[in-house]
């Protein structure tokens, strides 16, 4: 897909326009989907930290596994915490709640410093070499663990942003994962135009994402009344509903060990006073 990224803009526009007509979607969505896939291919095959990342979240459910139909436009990534200087098991060491909170804050600060001072500069250099001044990369003003990529765009749609958000965190679990094949919509319709129509991406299994979303909604069920409900959480209900229509539900429900690992991880690294994670089990969730 790198060859499509570097062809004249008018030729890409024609490709996206024709794909949109065939698929009954807006040109802007076809265009952004291409750049999401291009970024995934870059991150996992050409980026300096290609071996230190894993793909997770809603976009993985749609692009890697075809489990949901909503257009997921952000890329959620796990960064190996060894990149930040931690030993492979160091974050799991026993600590008091107070010391664990201090560790978690320090880990997040290290991640933010790495993204701002090292990762961003490397990505800018690499993408500029491919795309020239047509791409802009910067840290989100409101979230220092998010890198925004303003990709070359020819189409607009009020329902989507003309940028890709790379949401990158080190306090996330790597397993279980598999290598998944990811293909942009344009390559599904016009694969012969692509020298590389798809890309292999190390991706968290949907069964873990299932339990991640179940535990999110379990926590929200106990949210204290004086604490405002977070925005954009309807997606978790939708994603979980769609996964429950597939074998992912049965696979996840049969894997109590995976549920325990998800709960233990959240309780250690994302402790929440009202979440009642101790009550989570198949009989209570």
Which residues are covered by each model-predicted region?
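Structured mid-to-C-terminal alpha-helical surface segments
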Residues: 1-53, 65-69, 75, 81-284
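Glycine-rich beta-strand-to-loop/alpha-helix junction loops that act as flexible
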Residues: 55-59
